[in-house]
Amino acid sequence: MAAATAAAALAAADPPPAMPQAAGAGGPTTRRDFYWLRSFLAGGIAGCCAKTTVAPLDRVKVLLQAHNHHYKHLGVFSALRAVPQKEGFLGLYKGNGAMMIRIFPYGAIQFMAFEHYKTLITTKLGISGHVHRLMAGSMAGMTAVICTYPLDMVRVRLAFQVKGEHSYTGIIHAFKTIYAKEGGFFGFYRGLMPTILGMAPYAGVSFFTFGTLKSVGLSHAPTLLGRPSSDNPNVLVLKTHVNLLCGGVAGAIAQTISYPFDVTRRRMQLGTVLPEFEKCLTMRDTMKYVYGHHGIRKGLYRGLSLNYIRCIPSQAVAFTTYELMKQFFHLN
């Protein structure tokens, strides 16, 4: 999710130039469709590269957040060593296949929804500047989450499994089992509310922070922080190391604000996999249980240090890849 939001934030800070009118059939509408297709591909590729880079950290985060009994007494780095010892090296990438399937539509929906909401907020409500980026980013993030939530649910279930204790043999089997045993279609949306409540500040703050840092940086120090885009010399883009810094700051702030909702969401998604399932049926009950049994630092914010460690490499790969893809697909 973070990677797609990072790439979307980059697109938000650099809106595409107006498309020229094309003569004959397949004019401006076709060209605009091609723009969204290119955005879809650019965002999907960037998201997949970033998520694959930090997949081992994502796996450990799920295990620590939900207090898996094999690893609940371990920290981040000791868990990174313990997982390969127990499950092999590929154990660090368990659930990543489902994430790759999810990240492409997630990125596409987020890009299109952001542009739509940004235009709607500007034209209908008369709100512009950084505020409309904050609002549109929050709404786009929530829209993308709702549309792709079942895939994230399955990914979490697969990531939580430990070798020798598999409830699901793969993505399709997980879908079938959840549908059959956990209330049909609604079983795929357990934990949606805390996810939405967490996504609103996460996506909004990510868009707002990165967009603000980028616009201020390129306005006040264009030579030091920026360079001409390879596909359009008239457009300035951030240098790679500056992208890393801005993305890291945006991600760290957004994660800190939304992390308790992320912990709550993971526990609700895991559902019957956890022994305390009946105590975590609602968002309120889940937060109360986690806080009561584990406190704030070891409960609601357990694994946050891992998210901070994930933030810099994830944002670096996402922004760098997306910058390259924007130039490759002529999006500047």
Curated annotation (Swiss-Prot):
InterPro entries: GDC-like (IPR002167), Mit_carrier (IPR002067), Mitochondrial_sb/sol_carrier (IPR018108), Mt_carrier_dom_sf (IPR023395)
Keyword Thylakoid: no
Residue spans crossing the bilayer: 37-57, 88-108, 134-154, 191-211, 244-264, 299-319
Solcar repeat residue numbers: 34-120, 128-216, 238-328
Membrane topology, from the record: Multi-pass membrane protein
Keywords tagged on the record: Membrane, Mitochondrion, Mitochondrion inner membrane, Repeat, Transmembrane, Transmembrane helix, Transport
Keyword Membrane annotated: yes
PANTHER family: SOLUTE CARRIER FAMILY 25
One Pfam family cited in the UniProt record for this chain: Mito_carr
GO cellular component: mitochondrial inner membrane; mitochondrion
BP-aspect Gene Ontology terms: mitochondrial coenzyme A transmembrane transport; mitochondrial transport; pantothenate metabolic process
Subcellular location per the Swiss-Prot or TrEMBL entry: Mitochondrion inner membrane
Listed name of the protein: Solute carrier family 25 member 16
